[in-house]
């Protein structure tokens, strides 16, 4: 009995230690190649056409994406389209660029807390016995979340999920997968494990796509799975069929409806029971999404320059396990983002509207980027590299994914800048300028910080 208690205590100790270690060091330690001569805005290089939409991937072999340790993709789901259930070995952060829909992120061990009588749903039945018993059969499932334009969605590694477009327009979702995260112990090649579907055979890049997306049931022995699920082998053969002409996103036979909390209840943050390791929430009750469209809730706001929403581990606590964060920015016509550098991670920028002139400078003083970026393009700003941007005449909007749960930046101009924090004598001697010039360098942006109005006007 004593030995059993000792082993139990040791096991719990190791479990807690592992959890703490993952929270503190959630990223791989092997060196990444961030030695390149050029950064530029990139468009997706691989397009997979499915029955219910398209899946586009940026080239993960590009140096800028290898430096950041991420793989980026964009999914477009047609109305009544279903993105088939799948999981991946690395955490994913998603931005809903357009449309609305439903998503369920299924966490192992969490209760099936939602149920509905099948007679309440419109379903195609193929068995007479099902028609006879339809009033007594219930469908149990985990929580289904509403998606809207502007949502940031966190999907943990290994968590199976599906997405359905119940709206009247295309649902467009842009996401990054952090293949350099500690939870991914395979390698830095992106993989997606599908529970249904398969890659269509048409297309020049079929082979590359087939190496990335797999139906996990297809290679199993049908008799073994039949016994495991306790269902006929014909059912298993249907599960194993990749239905290659349908692809990764399919059209639902009829409009689907699900039991879910009402819209207001879905916005509340449910609290789990207090655990001995100090965590106040469990994965079963954590929020997976938050919205960044509200002007009133912007973290940074300037009447003459724009606004920025930040989504970090404080706003979305699940991000402390994923060590990712995001920001949504809106820069007015000809306004600037202060030159700055990220102290805690790489930044992956996706342009959602407008255009901007972007400059990125490395530690050698080389301009790795001095280009105009446009809607639909993506580029990487490596950690500690200094960058700035000026919006075009039509403004500039972006979403930035960051490989850290606690983003921290160090601006060079403005109220909270490094220059403003220096004594005048340090500035005058560093740049060989007069005290008046040093004072202007420190103070001419007034109370502005990060977002700077065009022409130096104060907001």
Swiss-Prot record:
Domain Cupin type-1, first and last residues per copy: 37-237, 290-439
Domain of life: Eukaryota
UniProt keyword annotations, A-Z: Allergen, Disulfide bond, Seed storage protein, Signal, Storage protein
InterPro entries: 11S_seedstore_CS, 11S_seedstore_pln, Cupin_1, RmlC-like_jellyroll, RmlC_Cupin_sf, Seed_Storage-Functional
Region (Disordered), start-end ranges: 118-139
Residue ranges with Basic and acidic residues bias: 121-139
Signal peptide: 1-21
Cysteine disulfide partners in this protein: 34-67, 110-284
CDD domains: cupin_11S_legumin_C, cupin_11S_legumin_N
Reported tissue expression: Expressed in seeds (at protein level). Expressed in seeds.
UniProt feature coiled coil, ranges: none
Family: Belongs to the 11S seed storage protein (globulins) family.
Task of the protein: Seed storage protein.
Protein name: 11S globulin seed storage protein 2
Source organism: Sesamum indicum (Oriental sesame)
């Amino acid at each position: 009995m004593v030995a059993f208690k000792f082993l139990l205590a040791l096991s719990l100790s190791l479990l807690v230690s592992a959890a703490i270690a993952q929270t503190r060091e959630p990223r791989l330690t092997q060196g990444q190649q961030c030695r390149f001569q050029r950064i530029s805005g990139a468009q997706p290089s691989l397009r997979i056409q499915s029955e219910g939409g398209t899946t586009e991937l940026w080239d993960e072999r590009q140096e800028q994406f290898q430096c950041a340790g991420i793989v980026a993709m964009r999914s477009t789901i047609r109305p009544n389209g279903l993105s088939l259930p799948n999981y991946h070995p690395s955490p994913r952060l998603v931005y809903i660029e357009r449309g609305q829909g439903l998503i369920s992120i299924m966490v192992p061990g969490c209760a099936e807390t939602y149920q509905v009588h099948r007679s309440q749903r419109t379903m195609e039945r193929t068995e007479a016995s099902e028609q006879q018993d339809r009033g007594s059969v219930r469908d149990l499932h985990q929580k289904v979340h509403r998606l809207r334009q502007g949502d940031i969605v966190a999907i943990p590694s290994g968590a199976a999920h599906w997405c359905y477009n119940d709206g009247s327009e295309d649902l467009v979702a842009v996401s990054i997968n952090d293949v350099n995260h500690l939870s991914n112990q395979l390698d830095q090649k992106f993989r997606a494990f599908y529970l249904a579907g398969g890659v269509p055979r048409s297309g020049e890049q079929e082979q590359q796509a087939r190496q990335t997306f797999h139906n996990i049931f297809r290679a199993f022995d049908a008799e073994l799975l039949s016994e495991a699920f306790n269902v006929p082998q014909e059912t298993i053969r249907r599960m194993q069929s990749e239905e290659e002409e349908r692809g990764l996103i399919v059209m639902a036979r009829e409009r689907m409806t699900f039991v879910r909390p009402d819209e207001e209840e879905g916005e509340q943050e449910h609290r789990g029971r207090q655990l001995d390791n100090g965590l106040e929430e469990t994965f079963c009750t954590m929020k997976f999404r938050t919205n960044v469209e509200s002007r009133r809730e912007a973290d940074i706001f300037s009447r003459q320059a724009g606004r920025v929403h930040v989504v970090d581990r404080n706003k979305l606590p699940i991000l402390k396990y994923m060590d990712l964060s995001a920001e949504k920015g809106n820069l007015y016509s000809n306004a600037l983002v202060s030159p700055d550098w990220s102290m805690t991670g790489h930044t992956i920028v996706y342009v959602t509207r407008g255009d901007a002139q972007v400059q990125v400078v490395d530690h050698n003083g080389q301009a790795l980027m001095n280009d105009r970026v446009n809607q639909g393009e993506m580029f990487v700003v490596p950690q500690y590299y200094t960058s700035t941007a000026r919006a075009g005449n039509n403004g500039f909007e972006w979403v930035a994914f960051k490989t850290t749960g606690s983003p921290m930046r160090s601006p060079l101009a403005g109220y909270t800048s490094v220059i403003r924090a220096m004594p005048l004598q340090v500035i005058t001697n560093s740049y060989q300028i007069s005290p008046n010039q040093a004072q202007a360098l420190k103070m001419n942006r007034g109370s502005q910080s990060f977002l700077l109005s065009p022409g130096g006007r104060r907001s």
